[in-house]
Structures are given as structure tokens and as C-alpha cells.
From Swiss-Prot:
This is Phosphatidylinositol 4-phosphate 5-kinase 7. It comes from Arabidopsis thaliana. PANTHER family: PHOSPHATIDYLINOSITOL 4-PHOSPHATE 5-KINASE 7, PHOSPHATIDYLINOSITOL-4-PHOSPHATE 5-KINASE. Residues 329-750 form the PIPK domain. Pfam families: MORN, PIP5K. One of its GO terms (molecular function) is ATP binding. SUPFAM superfamilies: Histone H3 K4-specific methyltransferase SET7/9 N-terminal domain, SAICAR synthase-like. It comes from the Eukaryota. It is an enzyme of class 2 (transferase). SMART domains: MORN (SM00698), PIPKc (SM00330). It catalyses: a 1,2-diacyl-sn-glycero-3-phospho-(1D-myo-inositol 4-phosphate) + ATP = a 1,2-diacyl-sn-glycero-3-phospho-(1D-myo-inositol-4,5-bisphosphate) + ADP + H(+). MORN repeats lie at residues 16-38, 39-61, 62-84, 85-107, 108-130, 131-153, 154-176, 177-198. Its EC number is 2.7.1.68.
Amino acid sequence: MDMRSGDREFPNGDFYSGEVKGIIPNGKGKYAWSDGTIYEGDWDEGKISGKGKLIWSSGAKYEGDFSGGYLHGFGTMTSPDESVYSGAWRMNVRHGLGRKEYCNSDLYDGLWKEGLQDGRGSYSWTNGNRYIGNWKKGKMCERGVMRWENGDLYDGFWLNGFRHGSGVYKFADGCLYYGTWSRGLKDGKGVFYPAGTKQPSLKKWCRSLEYDDTGKFVLSRSASVNVEELRSLNTVTQSLSVKTSAGETTCDPPRDFTCHGPVSKSARFSGSGQSEGQDKNRIVYEREYMQGVLIRETIMSSVDRSHKIKPPNRPREVRARSLMTFLRGEHNYYLMLNLQLGIRYTVGKITPVPRREVRASDFGKNARTKMFFPRDGSNFTPPHKSVDFSWKDYCPMVFRNLRQMFKLDAAEYMMSICGDDGLTEISSPGKSGSIFYLSHDDRFVIKTLKKSELQVLLRMLPKYYEHVGDHENTLITKFFGVHRITLKWGKKVRFVVMGNMFCTELKIHRRYDLKGSTQGRFTEKIKIQEKTTLKDLDLAYEFHMDKLLREALFKQIYLDCSFLESLNIIDYSLLLGLHFRAPGQLNDILEPPNAMSDQESVSSVDVGLTQEHSIPPKGLLLVTHEPNSVNTAPGPHIRGSTLRAFSVGEQEVDLILPGTARLRVQLGVNMPAQAHHKLIEDKEESATIELFEVYDVVVYMGIIDILQEYNTKKKVEHTCKSLQYDPMTISVTEPSTYSKRFVNFLHKVFPEER
């Protein structure tokens, strides 16, 4: 069809002038809508495509690439407020590399995704502050560096616009703080180096932040950085009688985008007096914070500290063992890929099978599924990037029913473990040499098993299934799958998938592994890090609970211990996680309540550590359970009824954390208590100042390590150690004694109110 030029005026007042193909705009042309919007540029069979310029009646204008009626390619958009974006577009939204200068002269230069900052980018504020690092959905996330106009600098991790995770804060005057943050507030242990003291290498620290113990930091979704969600432009219609989308949809509404303010001076310095005779250049402070409140401080020598300091959250070294050595590096990567492939295959195969009650044959030796996964794929398996491997799945029907019993959706289970975000290797808290992996959403822990542990698990599985089915509140480890991978060079690796007892958005400040024995049950202070799992002799608290909550707890502990005793199991322990709540009246003194403020919101306050503090007010509140009001669900591996509390008229209860969440209280999950600090004589800790004696805590717990039988080897170990130590103090002992000692010890940890 011949090309020709012409003008055409439409009944609604629109006007077109330019080249046409038949009656359709094609080539160069200009279209004016009746409201004043004008496009001039290339057309392709009735669609705006190619190079062009679009000016909306609102005053917004775009000049650049179009495709199929969309802003698509590279172009520059000037909004009515004079903010300018120049960069990549995809389907009417900013997507790719781009630079935006805001109307107040703030500047962002970096990657965009679906209209929001996402990826690497730099944001400069007009007041001189600047952030360089990662972004996610318009907010500062993951690794990034913030430098304030006053010279302060923070290098570390972020989440939803907050300082969150490991980081180092360097003050303009030379002071330095290494530690962890939670939603913009210091939370957990850290080290403060006054100006002039010997400080660890900042360069080395920054490199170490590339490695994190969990690989992610998942807490509150609340954010303080509010970047507008851009509304997509409507497509430019093919019909010439309908106008192009209005330009105002591309303009940014007034921005509410502020940066973190520098840490207040009151948060830097201790108010405790220093002896004039002390060498201030040698003194550093090991501090512990709780939601921004300083609760504990230890004065140390920088010389003593220099060889101890390790960046928080860096995986600690584990002594080499055959399995650990084998699974280093490339082999470990292949192993994770194989595990994900195998679980995807297993769940996909068993899910369509109609649900039924398990039979004796479902536990037997023939209850195994085997499959070979060649690299190039087969009729039953997909091609993959790992090495050839063989997969064995144990008792698939049993574990399918267990997953359903704990209300785990098959698709969500696969996505948690087999999703694109993958698995994260975490350091082992024990001496077993096992390797632990954490799912990307923290819901599941995967642990390597010894052959003997696998055999114990399979033998106990029928009774375990019965016990878990009869007791919905059991504290015993939840097992969701047992698998074996045989790599092409013959190495066999066995895995068990378990529920993560600490799957919570609350920060776990303390972790304890409690057995009730005392011989060797302590942690050397030089080895204690932010996420170290402590032991019996390290526990300096006793926990006071509501009467009915405590009764429910010990009722289940008795049942679980009796079950383990009947199976001849020993060496199990109570894994205890504690979330401390900060004393509310100090939040405004020791740490700025709004860490996102552009300027310091707190003046310098001299806070003395030696002054007396009254018992803090309750940071927790039990209220009658309201299913529709609970905004944070318990971990996905938890089932059972909501607990009742004596203090609320024996009603089912929720736990309110003021300003944080309303949580459903279940056995071992979200259980409130008061932690009473016990005074312990310890010369090494004479420089430690404990600010409070009573804390509100949220308790998480479960019974773990239940795969050790009291066999001949353990009997010999008990006999030998009994010759050296008091038999009641050593961990290894016969099952009935172990059970009684374990329960008696927990009675001391959770004493009955008098």
C-alpha cells in the first residue's frame, strides 16, 4: 500500500498530521489530542514506535524510544515538578540503568526494576548525605554504605531502609562501633572503640561483610524509606479517536524519602567514670544493646581485644572432618543443587497420591524411592547443571503425612527449599561435624546425618509418628523428610529436613543448648560471638512464667521425655531462644527512636551506668486471643491450640509487644516470661556492668538431638568418664537417669512461683 501524507481532524477534536498507510498513521507524524497532549515522532501501523517526543497537557514531557505504544527503550522524562529521569524504560516503567534528579535536587543513579530502585545504586541528598549500595523495591537493602554530611559513616547491612544486621559505624571524631542493628537500632553485642585506641582494619571488616551467618536478615516489614510506587502509563491506543494516557501518571507525587540520621552522641559514650590512672588509649567497651537500649557493658583492653575480634555473623571455622573436608567448595555447591532437585522430584511424585493412613509397609525396608539423575536428564528427570547423582527418599508416604499434619503446603515446602534463592550453609553449633543448611525464608533447617543416626531415626519413626500424632504440642524436633545422595565418585551423604524452631521475625538475642549436665557445659568467653549457642553453665537467668503456661510446658516435657526414655534415647537437649524486650522508659535516652531522621533527634545526654534503675515496666502484655487480630503467624512447623493463661482468666491468649506485633501464644512459640538475672561470682567479669536484673523476654524452645541411643559405645563412655568425674555431672548416662536429671534441671530454669 502506498505511503502518503495528509491531515485529518476527528469529531472529538483530535488532530493528526503526517504520513499514513491507508488510513493508519505510519512513518513520521504528529498527533494532537483535544486536551492539549501532543506526540510527534515515529509511527508503525497505527502505533507509536521508534523515536519521538510526547508532551502531556500537565506539562510532563518524554523524549526517547517508544515501542508498540509504550515508553520502551531509552528516554528522558521531565515531570511537572521539574524532576528529571533519564535512562531505561520497559513498558512505560523505569526499568534498567537510569538517573533521576528530584525536584529538591536529590539524585539517584543506578538500577531500577518495575519503577523502583532495585539493585546497585547511589543516592545523594541535598544536605550532603550519600548512600551507595544495594536497593530492593525502592528501599535500601542488603549491603550498603551511608556517609553523612558530618563525616559519620556506616558500612553494613540494611533491610527495608533500616540499618539491619552486621555493620561498622565510624564517627567523624575517630570513634568506631562494630556490632549488629535491628530495624535501625543497635540490637545485640558489639564493640566500641574510642578515638585513639587501636582499631581493627576497617578494610578487612568491610570485606568480611560479604559473608553472613544466615545470608539474610528477615524481621519486620515496616519501613522508614518511602519511595513512591509509580503508576504505569496506560498504553497509547491504536485508535486515533482515543487519546494517549495522561502525562500526570508519570510524575512523582511529593516524596517522603529521608535518610538515616547519624547516631547520637549519647549512644557513643559510656557515662561510667574512668580512673584517671587508666590508659584511655588501651580501653575499649564490649557492649550489649536491646532495641537501642544499652543493657550491659564490659571494659576491656584493646590489646586483649585485638586478637579476639571477629566480625559478627561470619561463619566460624569448624575443625576439619572427613565429611566437612569433602563437602568444601565445588562439592558443596553440587550437593545443594542435588538436594533441591531430589526434593522437588520427591514432593512432586508423592503429592498427587491420594492421602491415606500410613501402614506398616510405609515404614519398612521397601519404603524407599530411588532415582538416578544424569546431568543430561532422562525420561523421568530434568537436565541440570550439577554432576550425575543417585537419589534415595526414605518413607515418602510417612513424611508426606507428617508435612500435612503440620499444615505444610507442598508447593510452599518446595519453594522454601528449592526456590531460586537457594539454601544457605550455617555454622554448626555442636561437635557432631554435621553440616547445616537454612532455607531462604528461615522456615526449614537441613542437617547432614551419620549413618548410625539415620538408622536410629528409621527405627524410631513408627513410634515417632504415633507420638507426634497424639500430641499436637510436642516440643520434639519436627522431621519432614529424610534423603540420601550418592555422588558419582561414590560418596554418600544423608540429610534430614526439620522445622526451624527460631522461625520468627523477632531477633533471637540468646541461644542456649541445655542438657542438665555440668561437666564441660560452658563456653569459653573468648569464643562467644553474636550467634554462639551457649550451654548450661553459661545460663545466668531463671524464667518466671504464668502459672498455666508453665503447667502446659512441663506437662509436655514429661510426655516427650518419657517417650525418648522408652526408645533408649539420651544426649537430647532443650534448645532455648530468647528475645529480650527493652525497658521502655530508656528508649528515648540511649538511642534515637527514629533512626531515619535527617538530623539528630536526641541531644547529648550523660547516662551513667552506675546509677540505680528501677525494675523496668512490662514490655509484654497478655490479652485474650482474637484470631483476626494476630498479625504474625507462628512458625510454619507449629500446630496445636493457643495456650491459656491464668492471669487472663484462663482464656486463650495472644502476646502483645508494644509497637511491634501481636503474636499467638503456643507451646514453645511466643511464650512470655520474666528473666531474672542471677548474680554469679566471676572474677573475669568484674569489669562488666549489668544495668538491669529483670527483663521481659519472649521464649522459643524445642527438644533437639534425639537420634543418640544408649548403646554399648555410650555405656563404655559412661564407665570411663565416671572414673574421672561425678557420674551425675557427665552428659552420658542411662536413659531414665538422663530424663530425670533433664527435667529436674528445667524445673530450676523455670521455677514455680511461690
